[in-house]
UniProtKB/Swiss-Prot annotation:
Participates in transcription elongation, termination and antitermination. The gene is nusG. This is Transcription termination/antitermination protein NusG. SMART domains: KOW, NGN. Residues 126-156 form the KOW domain. It comes from the Bacteria. It holds the Pfam family NusG. Keywords: Transcription, Transcription antitermination, Transcription regulation, Transcription termination. CDD domains: KOW_NusG (cd06091), NGN_Bact_1 (cd09891). Gene3D superfamilies: 2.30.30.30, NusG, N-terminal domain. It comes from Neisseria meningitidis serogroup B (strain ATCC BAA-335 / MC58). PROSITE patterns: NUSG. One of its GO terms (cellular component) is cytosol. GO terms for biological process: DNA-templated transcription termination; regulation of DNA-templated transcription elongation; transcription antitermination; transcription elongation-coupled chromatin remodeling. Belongs to the NusG family.
Amino acid sequence: MSKKWYVVQAYSGFEKNVQRILEERIAREEMGDYFGQILVPVEKVVDIRNGRKTISERKSYPGYVLVEMEMTDDSWHLVKSTPRVSGFIGGRANRPTPISQREAEIILQQVQTGIEKPKPKVEFEVGQQVRVNEGPFADFNGVVEEVNYERNKLRVSVQIFGRETPVELEFSQVEKIN
C-alpha cells in the first residue's frame, strides 16, 4: 500500500501541538514506515503597524492537520487516539477517505507560496482612504484606486498641489484610515 493524504480534525488552536505529539508517538511506536509528512498548513502574513513591518504566521485551515499515511488499523488508531484529535474528515468513522492527489498538491503549493511570498495581513479595497507613512508622499492622505496583491502594491490617488495624482506605493508605505 502507498501513503495518501488524510485530513485530521484537531481542536482549534492546538494544531501545532497535535503535529508535535503525533510525530513523537510515531517515533515512540516505531511506526515511521506508515507515515510521511505531517503538516499544519500556514501562510506568512505581513502586518504593518506604525510604519513597522512584522511577519507572522496564520493557519490556512484552522482546526485541521494534514497527515500523509498508509491507512492500517494500527496507524488509524495511533492518529485517532492522539490527544486533541476529533477524528478524520471524509469517509466513515473507521475508514476515512483520503483527499485526492490533486487536492494535496494544491494545498502543498499554497503552503510553499505562502512561505515564499508573505500575504498582507491588512486587506486593501478600491475606494478606501489611506495615509502614506513613508517615502516622498509621507503624511499625505489618498484613495486606493487599484490593488495588486501579487506585487504587494497599491495605486493611490493623492492630492498634490490641488490636483489628484496617481502614485504607486508598496503596502508597507500606507496604513488604513479608520
